């Protein structure tokens, strides 16, 4: 029963086919891993940019807080001055009325 093809050749062809399938699977996994690595690097870059933006925002918030505190203090003193002026004017008017009524 000779078919013209040695029996060892059939085994080698099957082995080559399995080897090729395995190589294709390895290539597919390598491609997937390359895509994953690219995504990780891209994500790292975006996180780094986000961290920089967060730092800048924090610095801006600190500066705003300082400016707001200074402004609050400034207008508190202005308010105190206005109250002092108003009370002084009222006292002067009362003194004038008392002096005018007594004379």
From Swiss-Prot:
It is found in: Early endosome membrane; Recycling endosome membrane; Synapse, Synaptosome. GO terms for cellular component: apical plasma membrane; cell surface; clathrin-coated vesicle; clathrin-coated vesicle membrane; cytoplasmic vesicle; cytosol; early endosome; early endosome membrane. It comes from the Eukaryota. GO terms for biological process: calcium-ion regulated exocytosis; cellular response to type II interferon; establishment of localization in cell; Golgi to plasma membrane protein transport; negative regulation of secretion by cell; positive regulation of receptor recycling; protein-containing complex assembly; retrograde transport, endosome to Golgi. The record marks 44-47, 63-64 as: (Microbial infection) Cleavage. Residues 18-78 form the v-SNARE coiled-coil homology domain. SUPFAM superfamilies: SNARE fusion complex. SNARE involved in vesicular transport from the late endosomes to the trans-Golgi network. Belongs to the synaptobrevin family. Interacts with POPDC1 (via the C-terminus cytoplasmic tail). Interacts with BCAP31; involved in VAMP3 export from the endoplasmic reticulum. Interacts with BAIAP3; this interaction is increased in the presence of calcium. Interacts with PICALM. This is Vesicle-associated membrane protein 3. It comes from Rattus norvegicus. The lineage of its organism: Eukaryota, Metazoa, Chordata, Craniata, Vertebrata.
């Amino acid at each position: 029963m000779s078919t013209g093809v040695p029996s060892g050749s059939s085994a080698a062809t099957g082995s080559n086919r399995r080897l090729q399938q395995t190589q294709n699977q390895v290539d597919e996994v390598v491609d997937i891993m390359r895509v994953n690595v690219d995504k990780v690097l891209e994500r790292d870059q975006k996180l780094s940019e986000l961290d920089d933006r967060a730092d800048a925002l924090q610095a801006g918030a600190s500066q705003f807080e300082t400016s707001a505190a200074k402004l609050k203090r400034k207008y508190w003193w202005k308010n105190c001055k206005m109250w002092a002026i108003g009370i002084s004017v009222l006292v002067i008017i009362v003194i004038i009325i008392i002096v005018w009524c007594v004379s």
